[in-house]
């Protein structure tokens, strides 16, 4: 099938878009010269796409969008059943996938109406690896609108509720993933994290959520926001399942440009080591956020004291770059997502790997009704588009340079300490804003909890939220941060804390 050739008028319009001056005669010459290039386009159009085969049968599996009665938390987007290998690290485990992760043959909406009706044609790498490890996939978990919220009120078509209190946020953007694990509907779930989206819902719901080192787990087949902050990782009900899940998913796949020789470890080997002798730095900046609830801080300090009682060496540490990293998220995240996720239709350009052409085509439809985009996404796009058009991306570029400086601040502290600890979020889960709330309230409830979680997306360090108590019946999260590829050390401390006490009694 031949692609549609441009007309002379279209070439003249392109001339204007490219800020050029051409006569009609010159434009006609270029139009003629363009034809051999379009012959190559014809060939590309005719050839079958080169994507991974679907290795696990789903012809017999059902696909069902649950009713409100079947889905009281609104945590499911689609139900299905895909059985993996008979044996493996995750044999017998049921799993939910965040709905920005491609599962071939099952609809994917990414919490956003423009993607309604999209059905992936191949599996994400993490899907294949979970199935290889014996897991059974039960469906797609609701996520926030294009994953741009730490609250759980932005998903199309309805908010996700916290299993501990209906009408309260489950956290975002992996809102359904954490809610399904916390409610016991699945054993384990996959989440994504660009500003805290694994760790925030884990803190709000009382689950264990690991944002791995950037690039440790392949992002192939997961809808991108901005490649330098894209992460995918496990959300579970206990530490061992988390370690097993990371073991199954980690490692290079040769298709993800985010990966540069990722170092995979034997994560379960750390679970019985205890914390005796571990050096833990209590990050002072992590307790100094403007909206820090002192009661949350007290719960976290009590948890740190327990780690000290178990044998860890604990002392305060200051890393000024922590705050800088959080601020760098604005030019990197806003300009990056505006280019890659929006103008680049969920893919962007200039990288080698696996592109989802069908997703790119579907994502382009956001322009047909941009008014329906969420307020939190619009805000990021307004900032990003202004930075790109007024300053030509210079602040994105400079912020990426400064991100290396911010990483050095963490790395320097982690030469002295094995772990850094702080509250995952400064607050517990908050009530959903009313449906008719102002733009200001809508956005505030989407972003009020990211102060401690966004920095590690910028620096790439592994960070995990573990539940450490209840406050007025709502979970509190303790966050553990380690060196790049030192997820095992995080599991070491998390397992020791978990074994020492039932967090629900704290």
Curated annotation (Swiss-Prot):
InterPro entries: Amidase, Amidase_CS, Amidase_dom, AS_sf
Enzyme class per UniProt: hydrolase
Coiled-coil region(s): none
The organism's place on the tree of life at top rank: Bacteria
Gene3D superfamilies recorded: Amidase signature (AS) domain (3.90.1300.10), Glu-tRNAGln amidotransferase C subunit, N-terminal domain (1.10.20.60)
Catalysed reaction equations from the record: a monocarboxylic acid amide + H2O = a monocarboxylate + NH4(+)
Keywords per UniProt: Hydrolase
Family under the similarity heading: Belongs to the amidase family.
Name of this protein: Amidase
Entry's EC annotation: 3.5.1.4
Active site: 98, 173, 197
Molecular function GO terms recorded: amidase activity
NCBIfam families named among the record's database cross-references: PRK07235.1
Membrane-spanning segments: none
